[in-house]
């Protein structure tokens, strides 16, 4: 992270990235007078934005062997996401780096490790590399991992650490919204207000729209959720969270969800909703065969 002593030249770039304005992050990345450390962080953010947009091959081809270690880690994430059939070798390379005392403690490498192992649903392994924190990105990832482990008590402790560092930080606000959604009940309204605040301060993104829509669904406002999700779909027709949320929302408003599910199958075959749907189909087929 940039030193608090001087101006934070990457503040706007980070904010674009955190809120899902990935193209804006890329378009506004030419920033003058950056230190060498800031240049590496800037390049990592830009390439992570390309990864978020699904441009894996661009990242793989642009980052060569001479690039800084954090950028090599970002390239590894692109390789992991681009070819699931080769993920074992990618994870093996990652483990080698993590075991190397000269680079293994680098914040970006630990962030990428946490992200990959979270994808693998190996949450304990993810936490092994992220739990010590050190950056707001790592603390926020810890919150996500604990929520996936259904340990909102640990997630709350991480959130308190973030609040002590910077209560107004975009990642602190996002982590608070994620936790409120996980806890549910009266906390849903608090999560909605966070996303509403984002939508008033910043250009609307799929991430903000999905956040508001999920809150609406939790509160039973499925028509409003559908409107928000269709707006998100107009911004990015392949966004997996938008498609997954539209599948759920369509079922609640009595509309067919098959088109959205088929789009999700084509663009993100590894998505948890696609796997659950396939499992349900298999179980249904087996049930039918038992009656045949």
From Swiss-Prot:
Locations listed in the record: Cytoplasm; Golgi apparatus membrane; Cytoplasmic vesicle, COPI-coated vesicle membrane
Q: How does it sit in the membrane?
A: Peripheral membrane protein
Assigned keywords, A-Z: Cytoplasm, Cytoplasmic vesicle, ER-Golgi transport, Golgi apparatus, Membrane, Protein transport, Transport
Tagged with keyword Transport: yes
Share an example GO biological-process annotation for this protein. Answer: protein transport
Role: The coatomer is a cytosolic protein complex that binds to dilysine motifs and reversibly associates with Golgi non-clathrin-coated vesicles, which further mediate biosynthetic protein transport from the ER, via the Golgi up to the trans Golgi network. The coatomer complex is required for budding from Golgi membranes, and is essential for the retrograde Golgi-to-ER transport of dilysine-tagged proteins.
Q: Which family does it belong to?
A: Belongs to the COPE family.
Subunit arrangement?
Oligomeric complex that consists of at least the alpha, beta, beta', gamma, delta, epsilon and zeta subunits.
Q: What is this protein called?
A: Coatomer subunit epsilon-1
User: Organism, per UniProt?
Assistant: Arabidopsis thaliana
């Amino acid at each position: 992270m940039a030193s608090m002593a001087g101006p934070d030249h990457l503040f706007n770039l980070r904010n674009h990235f955190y809120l899902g304005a990935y193209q804006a992050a890329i378009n506004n990345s030419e920033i003058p007078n950056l230190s060498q450390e800031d240049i590496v962080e800037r390049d990592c953010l830009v390439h992570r934005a390309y990864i978020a947009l699904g441009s894996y091959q661009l990242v793989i081809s642009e980052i060569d062997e001479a690039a800084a270690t954090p950028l090599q880690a970002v390239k590894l994430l692109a390789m992991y996401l681009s070819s699931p059939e080769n993920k074992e070798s990618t994870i093996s390379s990652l483990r080698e780096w993590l075991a190397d005392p000269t680079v293994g403690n680098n914040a970006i490498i630990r962030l990428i490790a946490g992200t990959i192992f979270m994808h693998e649903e190996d949450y304990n392994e993810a936490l092994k590399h992220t739990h010590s924190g050190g950056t707001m990105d790592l603390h926020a990832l810890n919150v996500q991992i604990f929520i996936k482990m259904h340990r909102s008590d640990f997630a709350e402790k991480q959130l308190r650490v973030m609040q002590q560092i910077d209560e107004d930080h975009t990642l602190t606000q996002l982590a608070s919204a994620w936790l409120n959604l996980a806890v549910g009940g009266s906390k849903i309204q608090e999560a909605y207000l966070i996303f509403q605040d984002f939508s008033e301060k910043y250009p609307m993104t799929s991430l903000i729209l999905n956040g508001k829509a999920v809150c609406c669904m939790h509160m039973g406002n499925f028509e409003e959720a559908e409107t928000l999700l269709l707006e998100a779909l107009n911004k990015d027709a392949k966004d997996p969270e938008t498609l997954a949320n539209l599948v759920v929302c369509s079922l609640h408003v009595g509309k067919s969800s098959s088109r959205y599910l088929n789009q999700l199958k084509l663009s993100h075959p590894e998505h948890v909703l696609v796997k659950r749907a396939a499992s349900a189909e298999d179980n249904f087929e087996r049930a039918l065969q038992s009656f045949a």
